[in-house]
Amino acid sequence: MNELKNNGTQIFMGIEIPIIEGGFGENQKVILAKTISEIHGQPLKKINQLINENIDEFEVGVDILDLKSGYLQSTEFLLNFMNRQSISNSTNIYLLSEQGYMLLVGFMKTEQSKKIRKKLRREYFAMRKAINSDKKSTSIINDL
């Protein structure tokens, strides 16, 4: 697993969500199940249940990581997003790649989840590409 980085927050649909990169690949944006539950207005328990019911559909290390399964050296990173009590009480703390998020939303099967999926893909996951593209352009210009 690549190192996880907390790169601040962004406002999405009026909700402040963390910008997390790493885990599946360097500089790859990822999302916690907790954040997904907030965006979709669903209890975290329901999101985790949906993941657990379909866990065979997710590829570990590509789509999903369970941060409670030893992927983190310590829980310090998670304290940016959860309190100690929540971390201790959680059976699973899922982290999903863009691909994993798309798979999960497919299981939700509601029109609202489809709308949110498209919006999140454009405004959260695609933002990484725009930022990286700007950095490359700046680098090329500076090299001239």
Language-model segments: what does each one mean?
Residues 1-139:
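An anion-engaging/catalytic patch
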